[in-house]
Amino acid sequence: MRILLTNDDGIHAEGLAALERIARTMSDDVWIVAPETDQSGLAHSLSLSEPLRLRKVSDKHYALRGTPTDCVIMGIRQVMDIKPDLILSGVNSGSNVADDVTYSGTIAGAIEGTLQGVRSFALSQAYVHENGTRVVPWEVVQAHAPALLGKLIDIDLPDGTFLNLNFPNCRPDEVSGTEVTAQGNLAFNLQVDERADGRGFPYYWLRFGERSGIFRPGTDIHALKQNRISVTPLKLDLTDYSVQDRVARALGHGVAD
């Protein structure tokens, strides 16, 4: 089995090293095409106005000055001579749950893999801040992902569907199981910090404030709070079929077929 790895935290990210160790429990034919720099929050963006610079780091390891989407395309179309059987995107430093998935470059790696016709999974590890420092328990995903992926690798997924895997912030022996979940909902409370440069001109940082949400049972955010691994099937079709008829009637078209 040929496996292509990517991420959005960059080629030197600890989560990518963890993902390679996980992938090598499944195959010896593991390839990496990952961003040269941190691409967090760029979602499914595609570089069309700038050239892509590809750098070979070592055997089957490549860094690309581009987005996670670019990395998957380059991996399949340029780097690898044969299409991969599986794409793993991650392991992200931080969960990708609820509305996070719309911002996530990690999710985008799996989206692009799915668009390219390759079975794709996104993996993310929840963390906690302690005394202002991010503490990521990578040992959780490393302990539990190999067996979980082994169970999921051969299931029949519809075209346009991929799996989003999130691992809880706890010790490996505190994981209370695995749950198949739906996407939850969080209020992000995005904040704008205004600052001034050395010449007095303003510049801005976006940051997340305290997040809030309704942690309904059966959702990804609820599962993580229960120290459970969340497995969420996501699909590329964003159509809201429940309102098609309503929109058709408003336009005087009658009920949509």
Swiss-Prot record:
A GO CC annotation given for this chain: cytoplasm
GO molecular function, a single term: metal ion binding
Keyword Metal-binding: yes
Reaction catalysed by this enzyme: a ribonucleoside 5'-phosphate + H2O = a ribonucleoside + phosphate
Cofactor remark from the record: Binds 1 divalent metal cation per subunit.
EC number(s) from the headed UniProt entry: 3.1.3.5
Keywords: Cytoplasm, Hydrolase, Metal-binding, Nucleotide-binding
Location within or outside the cell: Cytoplasm
Family to which the UniProt record says this protein belongs: Belongs to the SurE nucleotidase family.
Alphabetized InterPro entries for the sequence: SurE, SurE-like_Pase/nucleotidase, SurE-like_sf
Organism for this UniProt entry: Rhizobium rhizogenes (strain K84 / ATCC BAA-868) (Agrobacterium radiobacter)
Keyword ATP-binding: no
Cofactor(s), names only, from the UniProt record: a divalent metal cation
Described purpose of this protein according to its UniProt entry: Nucleotidase that shows phosphatase activity on nucleoside 5'-monophosphates.
EC class of the enzyme, as a word: hydrolase
Chief place where the protein resides: cytoplasm
Protein name: 5'-nucleotidase SurE
Domain of life: Bacteria
Binding site for a divalent metal cation: 8-9, 40, 92
